[in-house]
């Protein structure tokens, strides 16, 4: 067990939640709905993806190697801002941090620019509370495209708005650092995500504006789609060793792009576990290693984990039969 961790042995303590039960939908039977398309969002995301693909071409034709390396470094930092920050820390309170690490995670999160932390946390908490219903912002019962990116191209379902108003976000509102990011979202996040990553290669190693900008967009789009895969692929394809009744699956594809967020069936059963996986360091769960490093430094503490006993009991009770006891576990 990593330093400063806490083993949670009472599953029900974390599963109690008084809320309205929205009807669970099964994909082929999801009620038809006429979505209202947000034209500007369609234009914006279309441009970003086209520009990102052009940036990929430039990586192999005219861009300096340093520009590509710089984009990769920012991709890693931005991803940690999402996975270790917006997700495991602020959405689920899976661990606690001291101010220096919290500032770092807020800045890293701004590099990724997947909306403000406030909005990200709100949508994610709705997703967990009303998973795969119409109160889930990216309801996977409406198919791959909708849960991947389509939900950002249309107006929110009325049930998402209703449920969102009753969601407890007091911990986020009370955080001055997150209020700062929300208040200055456009200038602050825009500068950290796009302006500095574009100007830095031009200033320090003479990269062209065309190359610097389009590779910045490539890094941004690659990060976005990695996160999107957790909403789409990890709710459609894969095995379910912990709870076969959930749409959430164990997705190697999503895991590869998100530093350990693809163990999604486990995560939906034990959302408070800071590892988002039974062992936390299997395969490429870099986010857990990132948190463990800062726990070793003393900047992260009270790391919550589910006990092996609870995990096994739950897998045997509700899993699809694919659960295997990890080697070395007592």
UniProtKB/Swiss-Prot annotation:
The protein's Enzyme Commission number: 1.14.19.15, 1.14.19.5
Bilayer-spanning residue ranges: 37-57, 65-85, 101-121, 185-205, 216-238
Position of sequence motif Histidine box-2: 124-128
Tissues and organs where the protein is expressed, per its UniProt entry: Highly expressed in the pheromone gland.
Location in the cell: Membrane
Keywords: Fatty acid biosynthesis, Fatty acid metabolism, Iron, Lipid biosynthesis, Lipid metabolism, Membrane, Metal-binding, Oxidoreductase, Transmembrane, Transmembrane helix
One Gene Ontology cellular component annotation held by this UniProt entry: endoplasmic reticulum membrane
GO MF annotation: an example: acyl-CoA 11-(Z)-desaturase activity
Pfam families linked: FA_desaturase
Predominant location: membrane
Cofactor requirement: Fe(2+)
Reactions catalysed, as given in the entry: an 11,12-saturated fatty acyl-CoA + 2 Fe(II)-[cytochrome b5] + O2 + 2 H(+) = an (11Z)-Delta(11)-fatty acyl-CoA + 2 Fe(III)-[cytochrome b5] + 2 H2O; (11Z)-hexadecenoyl-CoA + AH2 + O2 = (10E,12Z)-hexadecadienoyl-CoA + A + 2 H2O
Function: Fatty acid desaturase that catalyzes 2 consecutive steps in the biosynthesis of bombykol, a sex pheromone produced by the moth. First acts as an acyl-CoA Delta(11) desaturase (1) by catalyzing the formation of Delta(11) fatty acyl precursors. Then acts as a (11Z)-hexadec-11-enoyl-CoA conjugase (2) by converting a single cis double bond at position 11 of (11Z)-hexadec-11-enoyl-CoA into conjugated 10 trans and 12 cis double bonds.
Domain comment, as recorded: The histidine box domains may contain the active site and/or be involved in metal ion binding.
Similarity remark: Belongs to the fatty acid desaturase type 1 family.
Name listed for the protein in its UniProt record: (11Z)-hexadec-11-enoyl-CoA conjugase
Lineage: Eukaryota, Metazoa, Ecdysozoa, Arthropoda, Hexapoda
Gene that this polypeptide is encoded by: desat1
């Amino acid at each position: 067990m990593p330093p400063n961790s806490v083993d949670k042995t009472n599953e029900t303590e974390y599963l109690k939640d008084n809320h309205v039960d929205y009807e669970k939908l099964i994909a082929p039977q999801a009620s038809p709905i006429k979505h209202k398309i947000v034209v500007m969002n369609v234009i914006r995301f279309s441009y970003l993806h086209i520009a990102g693909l052009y940036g990929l071409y430039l990586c192999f034709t005219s861009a300096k190697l340093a520009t590509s390396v710089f984009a990769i470094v920012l991709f890693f930092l931005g991803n940690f801002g999402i996975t270790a920050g917006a997700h495991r820390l602020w959405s689920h309170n899976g661990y606690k941090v001291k101010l220096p690490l919290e500032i770092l995670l807020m800045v890293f999160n701004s590099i990724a620019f997947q909306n403000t932390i406030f909005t990200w946390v709100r949508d994610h908490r709705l997703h967990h509370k009303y998973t795969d219903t119409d109160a889930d912002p990216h309801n996977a019962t409406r198919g791959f495209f909708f849960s991947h990116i389509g939900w950002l191209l249309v107006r929110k379902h009325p049930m998402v708005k209703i449920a969102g108003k009753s969601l407890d976000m007091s911990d986020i509102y009370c955080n001055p650092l997150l209020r700062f990011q929300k208040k200055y979202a456009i200038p602050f996040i825009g500068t950290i995500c796009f302006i500095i990553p574009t100007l830095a290669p031009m200033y320090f190693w003479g990269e062209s504006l065309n190359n610097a900008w389009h590779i910045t967009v490539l890094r941004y789009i690659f990060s976005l789609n990695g996160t999107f895969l957790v909403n789409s692929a990890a709710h459609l394809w894969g095995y379910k060793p912990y709870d076969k009744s959930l749409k959430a699956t164990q997705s190697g594809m999503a895991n590869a792009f998100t530093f350990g967020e693809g163990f999604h069936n486990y995560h939906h059963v034990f959302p408070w576990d800071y590892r988002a996986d039974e062992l936390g360091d299997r395969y490429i769960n870099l986010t857990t290693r990132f948190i463990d490093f800062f726990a070793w430094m003393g900047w992260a503490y009270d790391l919550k984990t589910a006990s092996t006993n609870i995990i096994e009991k739950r897998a045997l009770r509700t899993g699809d039969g694919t659960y295997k006891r990890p080697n070395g576990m007592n």
